């Protein structure tokens, strides 16, 4: 039953959620880890009745050999799987509700400390619409470890906050799923539901998450300028290093 359900889950990810085959298979492999764990310990619980304690024990055992980012993806896959089960009326409860992803940690540029990034975020003027956008943008840029090109290309249809991940098109047009912390989600949601909603969005730019005041997709140059200005506002004179596009150019 588990493997048949896992196959159906992967079809759901592709057809209903629009994820690539590689991404769906990747999530399926995470579920396969759970299946192997259940087989190893002769646990007979099914997708419909597996309990939270069993899932918690599985995550604890497997997570010991994974870094924080891989742990977060595993938990994201499990959450997606059991939300799929609820979607298919396979169960009424959500056994992953109390199992949280680990802190992934901020991917820092070479020249900035965590304290400096926190100071930058705290310094942003939230009395303006751009301030709310910039805080959400910088929070996502660093907390999710995105390249600038990935940030400006991010679309509303790439946000899967119910499953705690975003879909990113990386180098070579390869799709990947990036876990996103609840705090970062909150910042982005506030921007989308408030400041972004007030914009007159230009035709063809409706799906981009981060927009300029004319309702158009931001450019890389704009991102660099915004981050540099925020850094300078707290007295940071050092060069700000951001992860750039696939070409590695700045």
What kind of feature is each model-predicted range?
Residues 1-250:
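Conserved catalytic core of the tyrosine transesterase superfamily
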